[in-house]
Amino acid sequence: MNVTLDVVGSARKVTLDLPEPKESVLHEVVAWQLSKRRQGSASTKTRGEVIGSKAKIYPQKGTGRARHGSRKAPIFVGGGTVFGPRPRSYAYTLPKRMRRLGLNMALAARANDGKLTLVESFQVDGKTKDFLRWADENGFKGLEKVLLVTDDELVRRAARNLPWTTVMKGAGLNVYDILRHEHVIADAAIFGGDET
């Protein structure tokens, strides 16, 4: 599916060849991303790791009660845990083709909604007030959540302190961040595409 986008600050248009978005692929890629981010530090102690006496708690016979050895057995409150969580990595690998496909589908989803904007130049010199003026002039001020994708350090410095923007480099662009932001504003240089 070809998507033609106007470039803000220029008369040119850019045509991107993007696939039709599929929820299953997007879900797969987001699940992969989030699993890599998991801390994986949940930990429990087994009966061998719980601190306590190793002595038999009462004689085997003659008490009329059930047979028990260790107070650290899982059956007791304060005892060890059986098959509890241990620190581990939840990361797994996803084919590169699927990752690329997911990224392109996320961009296509935003483009279909008219929420993907390419910009020729931000005309910002590192000051937040300049970026706010630029955003106001181009109708971006007041949007709920904006993902700003640019490699220009001055633009990143100007926009990073605003509560409604998330700023990232082109190399860090990912499916999860695209989908959790209402609007994506990107430097036209990051996307090649065909110019018209």
Stretches with model-predicted labels:
Residues M1-Q39, G84-T196:
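Extended polybasic, low-complexity segments that bind anionic RNA or targeting/receptor surfaces
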Residues S41-R47:
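Short coil/turn segments at secondary-structure boundaries
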Residues R47-F83:
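Glycine/serine-rich anion-binding loops at beta->alpha junctions
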